[in-house]
Protein backbone atom coordinates (compact mmCIF):
# COMPACT_ATOMS: atom_id res chain seq x y z
CA UNK A 1 0.00 0.00 0.00
CA UNK A 2 1.27 3.50 -0.78
CA UNK A 3 0.41 6.51 1.39
CA UNK A 4 -0.56 9.81 -0.28
CA UNK A 5 3.01 11.13 0.17
CA UNK A 6 4.40 8.13 -1.75
CA UNK A 7 5.56 6.06 1.25
CA UNK A 8 5.17 2.36 0.44
CA UNK A 9 3.90 0.22 3.33
CA UNK A 10 4.21 -3.55 3.37
CA UNK A 11 4.00 -6.21 6.02
CA UNK A 12 3.06 -9.81 6.71
CA UNK A 13 0.17 -10.57 9.03
CA UNK A 14 0.38 -13.87 10.93
CA UNK A 15 -3.39 -14.32 11.02
CA UNK A 16 -6.42 -12.33 9.90
CA UNK A 17 -9.77 -13.47 11.30
CA UNK A 18 -12.99 -12.37 9.62
CA UNK A 19 -16.21 -12.57 11.66
CA UNK A 20 -19.55 -13.40 9.98
CA UNK A 21 -20.45 -9.69 10.16
CA UNK A 22 -17.20 -8.77 8.35
CA UNK A 23 -15.35 -7.49 11.43
CA UNK A 24 -11.60 -8.05 11.24
CA UNK A 25 -9.23 -9.25 13.96
CA UNK A 26 -5.50 -9.03 13.28
CA UNK A 27 -3.46 -11.61 15.23
CA UNK A 28 0.31 -11.75 15.59
CA UNK A 29 2.21 -14.47 17.44
CA UNK A 30 5.18 -13.58 19.63
CA UNK A 31 7.64 -16.06 21.13
CA UNK A 32 8.39 -14.02 24.27
CA UNK A 33 6.30 -12.97 27.23
CA UNK A 34 3.72 -10.18 27.28
CA UNK A 35 5.43 -6.81 27.86
CA UNK A 36 4.94 -4.73 30.97
CA UNK A 37 2.30 -2.03 30.70
CA UNK A 38 4.92 0.67 30.10
CA UNK A 39 6.00 -1.11 26.88
CA UNK A 40 2.57 -2.02 25.49
CA UNK A 41 2.54 0.98 23.14
CA UNK A 42 5.77 -0.11 21.47
CA UNK A 43 4.45 -3.67 21.20
CA UNK A 44 1.30 -2.42 19.47
CA UNK A 45 3.17 -0.28 16.90
CA UNK A 46 3.41 -3.21 14.47
CA UNK A 47 -0.26 -4.02 14.95
CA UNK A 48 -1.34 -0.43 14.29
CA UNK A 49 0.75 -0.59 11.14
CA UNK A 50 -1.22 -3.64 9.98
CA UNK A 51 -4.51 -1.98 10.96
CA UNK A 52 -3.61 1.12 8.93
CA UNK A 53 -2.82 -0.94 5.84
CA UNK A 54 -6.09 -2.87 6.17
CA UNK A 55 -8.07 0.33 6.65
CA UNK A 56 -6.48 2.04 3.66
CA UNK A 57 -6.75 -1.01 1.36
CA UNK A 58 -10.12 -2.44 2.47
CA UNK A 59 -11.81 0.59 4.01
CA UNK A 60 -12.43 -1.33 7.25
CA UNK A 61 -11.01 -0.53 10.67
CA UNK A 62 -9.98 -3.76 12.40
CA UNK A 63 -12.25 -4.44 15.36
CA UNK A 64 -9.38 -5.94 17.34
CA UNK A 65 -5.59 -6.16 17.26
CA UNK A 66 -4.26 -9.11 19.23
CA UNK A 67 -0.72 -10.07 20.17
CA UNK A 68 -0.53 -13.68 21.41
CA UNK A 69 2.54 -14.39 23.55
CA UNK A 70 3.45 -18.07 23.29
CA UNK A 71 5.91 -18.11 26.21
CA UNK A 72 3.28 -17.41 28.86
CA UNK A 73 0.02 -17.80 26.94
CA UNK A 74 -1.01 -14.21 27.63
CA UNK A 75 -2.47 -11.83 25.07
CA UNK A 76 -2.43 -8.10 24.52
CA UNK A 77 -5.54 -6.83 22.74
CA UNK A 78 -6.45 -3.42 21.46
CA UNK A 79 -9.36 -1.91 19.51
CA UNK A 80 -8.24 0.97 17.27
CA UNK A 81 -10.53 3.63 15.86
CA UNK A 82 -10.36 5.67 12.67
CA UNK A 83 -9.07 8.79 14.43
CA UNK A 84 -6.19 6.89 15.95
CA UNK A 85 -5.28 5.34 12.61
CA UNK A 86 -5.17 8.83 11.08
CA UNK A 87 -2.81 9.96 13.86
CA UNK A 88 -0.71 6.83 13.39
CA UNK A 89 -0.51 7.49 9.65
CA UNK A 90 0.80 11.00 10.37
CA UNK A 91 3.34 9.47 12.78
CA UNK A 92 4.58 7.08 10.08
CA UNK A 93 4.89 9.94 7.59
CA UNK A 94 6.88 11.97 10.15
CA UNK A 95 9.17 9.01 10.89
CA UNK A 96 9.78 8.52 7.17
CA UNK A 97 10.51 12.24 6.72
CA UNK A 98 13.10 12.01 9.53
CA UNK A 99 14.70 9.00 7.81
CA UNK A 100 14.83 10.88 4.51
CA UNK A 101 16.48 13.87 6.25
CA UNK A 102 19.04 11.53 7.82
CA UNK A 103 19.80 10.01 4.42
CA UNK A 104 20.12 13.46 2.83
CA UNK A 105 22.48 14.73 5.54
CA UNK A 106 24.21 11.48 6.50
CA UNK A 107 23.34 12.22 10.13
CA UNK A 108 22.38 8.87 11.69
CA UNK A 109 22.71 9.45 15.41
CA UNK A 110 22.74 6.33 17.57
CA UNK A 111 20.04 5.99 20.20
CA UNK A 112 21.68 4.36 23.21
CA UNK A 113 19.28 2.35 25.38
CA UNK A 114 19.52 -0.45 27.93
CA UNK A 115 19.18 -2.94 25.07
CA UNK A 116 22.58 -1.78 23.81
CA UNK A 117 24.21 -3.60 26.75
CA UNK A 118 23.66 -6.89 24.90
CA UNK A 119 24.48 -5.68 21.39
CA UNK A 120 27.29 -7.38 19.49
CA UNK A 121 28.00 -4.22 17.48
CA UNK A 122 29.30 -1.94 20.24
CA UNK A 123 32.76 -1.94 18.66
CA UNK A 124 31.20 -0.31 15.57
CA UNK A 125 28.84 2.07 17.39
CA UNK A 126 29.80 5.71 18.02
CA UNK A 127 27.63 5.71 21.16
CA UNK A 128 30.09 3.20 22.66
CA UNK A 129 33.20 4.90 21.30
CA UNK A 130 33.31 2.50 18.37
CA UNK A 131 34.05 3.20 14.75
CA UNK A 132 31.60 2.20 12.03
CA UNK A 133 33.10 0.38 9.05
CA UNK A 134 33.63 2.47 5.91
CA UNK A 135 30.62 2.97 3.70
CA UNK A 136 30.75 0.61 0.68
CA UNK A 137 30.83 3.37 -1.94
CA UNK A 138 31.24 1.08 -4.96
CA UNK A 139 28.40 -1.24 -3.95
CA UNK A 140 26.14 1.72 -3.19
CA UNK A 141 26.87 3.31 -6.56
CA UNK A 142 26.16 0.02 -8.35
CA UNK A 143 22.82 -0.19 -6.51
CA UNK A 144 22.00 3.42 -7.40
CA UNK A 145 22.17 4.64 -3.77
CA UNK A 146 23.26 8.20 -3.05
CA UNK A 147 26.65 8.74 -1.46
CA UNK A 148 26.25 10.14 2.03
CA UNK A 149 28.56 12.60 3.77
CA UNK A 150 30.17 11.41 7.00
CA UNK A 151 28.93 13.25 10.08
CA UNK A 152 30.83 12.97 13.35
CA UNK A 153 28.65 12.60 16.44
CA UNK A 154 30.18 13.89 19.63
Residue ranges and their predicted role:
Residues 1-154:
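RecB-family 4Fe-4S metal-dependent nuclease core
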Amino acid sequence: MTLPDGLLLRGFVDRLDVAPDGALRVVDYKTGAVPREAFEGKALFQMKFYALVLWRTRGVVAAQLKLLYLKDGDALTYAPDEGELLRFERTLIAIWAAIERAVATGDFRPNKTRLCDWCDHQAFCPAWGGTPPPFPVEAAAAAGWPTLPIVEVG
